[in-house]
């Protein structure tokens, strides 16, 4: 019985420490990149909260391979019209082509331009303060499918 209780307590502590570590990484990421997201909101009318949320998820708080080696914080893949640098990475398929950026700010700017395509134009009728509407709208428009 003592072993079971010990295992449960240790498991709980491990999960708690992992969650605290993840939260600290998220907070550090937001602190580091919030001004870039705010600038993108000013320039392109995309909520900074949405931009940061997508970057956090896609880049693992800036720790993913794409983020660290290609400055790609949004997992944006190459398209036929992409003339910039590329980075090969196995995501859903082996050796897929992803966009590579000179710096993180370029990744954020390209993400904004990506969302300004026709596919997402309905989102721009929403207020930048309507983050829930933007989140639902991105899903409905097929973002990240």
Residue ranges of predicted features:
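Catalytic cores of secreted/periplasmic lytic hydrolases that degrade extracellular macromolecules
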Residues: 2, 17-145
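Hydrophobic h-region of N-terminal signal peptides that target proteins for export
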Residues: 10-18
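Sec-dependent signal peptide recognition
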Residues: 2-10
């Amino acid at each position: 019985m003592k072993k079971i209780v010990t295992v449960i307590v240790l498991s709980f502590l491990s999960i708690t420490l992992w969650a605290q570590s993840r939260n600290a990484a998220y907070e550090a990421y937001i602190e580091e990149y919030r001004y870039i997201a705010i600038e993108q909101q000013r320039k392109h009318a995309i909520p900074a909260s949405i931009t940061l949320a997508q970057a956090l998820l896609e880049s693992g708080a800036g720790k993913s391979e794409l983020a660290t080696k290609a400055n790609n914080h949004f997992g944006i893949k190459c398209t036929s019209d992409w003339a910039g640098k590329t980075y090969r990475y196995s995501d859903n398929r082996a050796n897929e082509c992803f966009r590579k950026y000179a710096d993180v700010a370029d990744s954020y700017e390209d993400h904004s331009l990506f969302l300004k395509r026709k596919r997402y134009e309905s989102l721009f009728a929403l207020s930048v303060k309507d983050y829930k509407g933007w989140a639902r709208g991105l899903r409905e428009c097929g973002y990240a499918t």
